[in-house]
Amino acid sequence: MPNSVLWAVDLFGRVYTLSTAGQYWELCKDSQLEFKRVSATTQCCWGIACDNQVYVYVCASDVPIRRREEAYENQRWNPVGGFCEKLLLSDRWAWSDVSGLQHRPLDGVALPSPHWEWESDWYVDENFGGEPTEKGGWTYAIDFPATYTKEKKWNSCVRRRKWIRYRRYKSRDIWAKIPSKDDPKELPDPFNDLSVGGWEIAEEPVGRLSVWAVSLQGKVWYREDVSHSNPEGSSWSLLDTPGEVVQISCGPHDLLWATLWEGQALVREGINRSNPKGSSWSIVEPPGSDNGIMHVSVGVSVVWAVTKDWKVWFRRGINSHNPCGTSWIEMVGEMTMVNVGMNDQVWGIGCEDRAVYFRQGVTPSELSGKTWKAIVAARECDRSHSGSSSSLLSAGCFFGDEVRGSGESAPSDTDASSEVERPGPGQTLPAEPLDDSKNAMENSASGPGAGRTTEDTVEDACPAEGSREARPNTHPGPATTPAELPWTNIDLKEPKKVPSHSAAGFPETTSLSSLGLFPLGLEEPYGVDDHPLRAWVSGGGCMVEACAVPRWFTVQAGLSSSVHMLSLSITPAQTAAWRKQIFQQLTERTKRELENFRHYEQAVEQSVWVKTGALQWWCDWKPHKWVDVRVALEQFTGHDGARDSILFIYYVVHEEKKYIHIFLNEVVALVPVLNETKHSFALYTPERTRQRWPVRLAAATEQDMNDWLALLSLSCCESRKVQGRPSPQAIWSITCKGDIFVSEPSPDLEAHEHPLPCDQMFWRQMGGHLRMVEANSRGVVWGIGYDHTAWVYTGGYGGGCFQGLASSTSNIYMQSDVKCVHIYENQRWNPVTGYTSRGLPTDRYMWSDASGLQECTKAGTKPPSLQWAWVSDWFVDFSVPGGTDQEGWQYASDFPASYHGSKTMKDFVRRRCRARKCKLVTSGPWLEVPPIALRDVSIIPESPGAEGSGHSIALWAVSDKGDVLCRLGVSELNPAGSSWLHVGTDQPFTSISIGACYQVWAVARDGSTFYRGSVYPSQPAGDCWYHIPSPPRQRLKQVSVGQTSVYALDENGNLWYRQGITPSYPQGSSWEHVSNNVCRVSVGPLDQVWVIADKVQGSHSLSRGTVCHRTGVQPHEPKGHGWDYGIGGGWDHISVRANATRAPRSSSQEQEPSAPPEAHDPVCC
């Protein structure tokens, strides 16, 4: 689960954050302002300060927020002076926007606010449709407006060129005041409340936010154009309301509720992608007539409310079709306010103690939760007082009698490891005097539940110099006095508390003072042991899973307030004695438990072991169907001590019992074949791989399949003597289901003569789920999931269904992934009713997949396999290729055809893509690399002779938004690296690759190719981009760079090789076609070429997604001359960039090679 942050405001206006991975409240970095309330998302936080002004806090990131400004220079040709800026009266402006209707001179483009800065000056964009233009960047046309081309023709009467300039948002990690360009007479009055949400409105562009605010006069305002690239928005819009609003809440989706002065609730209806402000209001009555609604908070599909008597209510029946719900349900507890987070988790602020509470037990099936739990996390400033006391105190207990009193702290340690509740009202904490001179200031301490009445006055007294306020101790114990020597008897006594400040009208808390001192001139509103009084909490940017609750509800073991102040000084000699004593005790225990029993004989000793079971088998003959079989795995030990196994499959044909057997030392892959109905897996042997017809077996349950898969995989590894983590030179691959496979390369795999056939490579599965993987010969492996999350390999093996002996005991972590399932709604036009779902008999299904050949309805479509679960409803996907209209439709003349987003007179059919998200949770040797989502990643391939220990490993990546990034600090000891370095580009990129000599090539979203110059270990980001012309009439989508070779893949599946690359001219000269039918390419450190072929015909079947190896690749023939086919049937990705294993040299390699045979594409159909 990625780290996220909970935001809170105390009564003094200070803003704090609490990370899901931490246990301390951290004071906001920019703490100069005092705030009333805040509303947070994952990337920013909006707030209303005490001056009633709106501020936004954008969290810092390695990727900057950049906006591109464009201006077009237009010229017309005349017979006297040629092209010039003198235009006709009917022409557009000489300097305009892309439409030509708006005047846009370069000096007239200004920054929108002081929070932006220019990156550079204006410059000409010399990229036109993915192709470089001539020097100057001019494009030509017959007239304005028309179709422009980069070539000048005889009838080119006008021309234009695009000037671009980037501005960068600089106010990050500080509170930036929201500017306003509105008329001062129309500016909104001071704001009283605001709420941020709407980032998951169905079909909405990624990064867009909805910011709603309420003014002191009860008016509702909406902030226009707020997005990730424009965090401030542009202007405020006023919305009409049926009454005066006092508070508002916006959820992540299309749910928006507000509170009226009269105690009723307002619900906004009609919120969608095209109208994020909604269309109408509906009124919801409060739970009771006596006490109206004071506060409301909404989430994805829940509504919580607090009435004026502090009661908490839950709204039943909330969904996307009924945002008003059906009825109110009262919850236990009294809160001043509640807030709903990203996944309907709920936080609140207690009515009496002003502490932050979390609603436990909130799940998709039980949205109301079960109970309230207080968050007992301390403040970050308190950590300095307790940084080493816990570890040193526990270390001292190992010395036995050297530290007395360790047994006394044991009960406290046991209690502190469990979840604790705050002391209730009236509970007092015992205290003893520390010094007689301070007895006059001593008072009894009470818990946070003991509050004053409104008649109580605030004592106008300050702590005496040298004293410090502290919060109540949640584990009261016997008070003692600290001793003078660190390694003698330890006694601690806690002094009484000096009365502290409290706000009138709010509960006052008292506690024991601590032993720490403040420097002169420094004061804090809370002492070390005080829990701050909260006024507001926001969980809009906090993601908490019900199965993985943060460590916010436990106190660190053995740490009372007095122990926090304790400082034990351990000398090196004492540390050495402690370690030696522990080692000696462990050695003696080993002798007692093992040495004394080694003379016993083994209870059971046998050389054959058999496991039997019932499975289903996909029979080899027609009609192909699943038949019930009995299977038996027989494992035996050979004469040489090696273990081998045979799998027997017993079946019945025409009442005759038969069987087939498979030697597991011949199995090259065990692949799960998960679908909607069967828990099946496939066994590949070299012969079955060539046939494209594996042995398929299915189990009754998922657990049975996992057991058999783990057992067979372990037996195969034992037969081949493969165990442990993969070697640094391993070849990694990914299937279309996201399964990860790894193969240990043989030295003969890249031999020029008699190379090892690909169908004999042994592939074993690793735990986890990825979309792509990239490896390096120094053991650094990165992966990217379907949800663009980056993962780094931890060095373990196993995970997922591989448990016990088939998995390492460490370096295995939880991993999740999210992907979208797409279906299409098809319609045909008729002259009577227009577009309807009634098509011709020859048409495709009206609800189908992308091909139209398979029927896929919204009700009948299931997740990809039983391991996936739906996490969203169906929504319209507007990001399909070709574009859509405002409703998501694409038009064409007929099925199937080329689709486009605008309707014409010749379009008789249309389709609309629907998507639904599903989630998978598994485990594997992978750790998440937050916080930037990635689209592509490339690690430098290193040849065997390269010196890799003297510098860090170069790693480049492309974010999901198209930003180019360079990872710093990557090494064998720190494979995740330390930080990202942003590399500026003029447009979004999709693919990137770095070669063994630091040559960086990339592909932009429009299919154009770029080369990054001057990349060195001392200059990891290089200096500039060089635009490389793409192959004629082709749009590239992927590039891979080896030691000296550069290969690229276009959108039509054609593989291209870059000719003419030399050290003095690394950009090369031209592209040469190598093959078609390719889906993915990977070039290794030896310039070896491996691809994933789209279709490969075997002797029995056709497989899609096959691993292929380019044969005959040599220095004098870098393109090779043929293909060798390996494992196939559902493979999506391969990475050979870690395989730097050279083949042994033969005597014939010195001879001149004969003429190469004719090259063939990797297709046999």
Swiss-Prot record:
Residue ranges of every copy of the PH domain listed in the record: 611-717
Localization per Swiss-Prot or TrEMBL: Cytoplasmic vesicle, Autophagosome membrane; Lysosome membrane
GO molecular function: phosphatidylinositol-3-phosphate binding
Listed InterPro entries: Beta-propeller_rpt_TECPR (IPR006624), Peroxin/Ferlin (IPR006614), PH-like_dom_sf (IPR011993), TECPR1-like_DysF (IPR010482), Tectonin_beta-propeller (IPR051513)
Alphabetical list of SMART domains matching this protein: DysFC (SM00694), DysFN (SM00693), TECPR (SM00706)
Region named Disordered: 404-486, 1140-1165
Pfam families: Hyd_WA, Pex24p, Tectonin
GO cellular component: autophagosome membrane; cytoplasmic vesicle; lysosomal membrane
CDD domains membership: PH1_TECPR1 (cd13300)
Free-text comment on this protein's domains from its UniProt entry: The PH domain mediates the binding to phosphatidylinositol-3-phosphate (PtdIns(3)P).
Function field: Tethering factor involved in autophagy. Involved in autophagosome maturation by promoting the autophagosome fusion with lysosomes: acts by associating with both the ATG5-ATG12 conjugate and phosphatidylinositol-3-phosphate (PtdIns(3)P) present at the surface of autophagosomes. Also involved in selective autophagy against bacterial pathogens, by being required for phagophore/preautophagosomal structure biogenesis and maturation.
Protein family membership: Belongs to the TECPR1 family.
Protein name per the record: Tectonin beta-propeller repeat-containing protein 1
